[in-house]
């Protein structure tokens, strides 16, 4: 499943219609219904807003919808590009927590590009820090979190 930067929803379609667009793999209607139920269980707010136009939702709700749409194809891998873009700090933490829950609870592999290092690395098994187009760090997430020099250089340019 793919969650693009900026969410890339269809603003004039409803939540349900956007979710159905994620069910692009040929599959039985019963599987699509199960996947829809899974999305609504995972993101109860989407069920409340099922008939609402995607373009009228908040940024956090739109991010939930983008994640839900990616889950509609029952993927084994989620590719997520900048999930925190345009979200308030509290929503960033909630979004990252939800990605972690999906990763661990449903055995999904997640490949995520994210500029918010501290949020991304706390759910990662491995991390890569790219500075000016070159890999500045590659390793286990615990190693990255304990590398004060890396963090100082990455955040402060020191």
Could you say what each language-model-derived stretch is?
Residues 53-57:
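Conserved ABC ATPase signature
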Residues 70-71:
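ABC ATPase C-loop
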Residues 78-82:
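Catalytic Walker B motif of ABC-type/P-loop ATPase nucleotide-binding domains
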Residues 93-107:
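Helical segment within the ABC ATPase nucleotide-binding domain
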Residues 112-115:
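H-loop/switch region of ABC-family ATPase nucleotide-binding domains
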């Amino acid at each position: 499943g793919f969650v693009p930067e900026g969410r890339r929803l269809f603003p004039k379609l409803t939540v349900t219609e956007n979710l159905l667009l994620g069910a692009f793999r040929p599959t039985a209607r019963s599987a699509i219904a199960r996947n829809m139920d899974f999305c609504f269980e995972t993101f109860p707010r989407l069920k409340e807003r099922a008939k609402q136009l995607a373009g009228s939702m908040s940024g956090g709700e739109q991010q939930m919808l983008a994640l839900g749409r990616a889950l509609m194809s029952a993927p084994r891998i989620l590719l997520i590009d900048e999930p925190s873009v345009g979200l308030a700090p509290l929503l960033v933490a909630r979004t990252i927590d939800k990605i972690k829950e999906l990763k661990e609870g449903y055995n999904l592999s997640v490949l995520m590009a994210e500029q918010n290092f501290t949020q991304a690395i706390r759910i990662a098994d491995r991390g890569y820090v790219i500075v000016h187009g070159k890999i500045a760090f590659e390793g286990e997430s615990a190693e990255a979190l304990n590398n004060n020099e890396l963090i100082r250089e990455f955040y402060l340019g020191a």
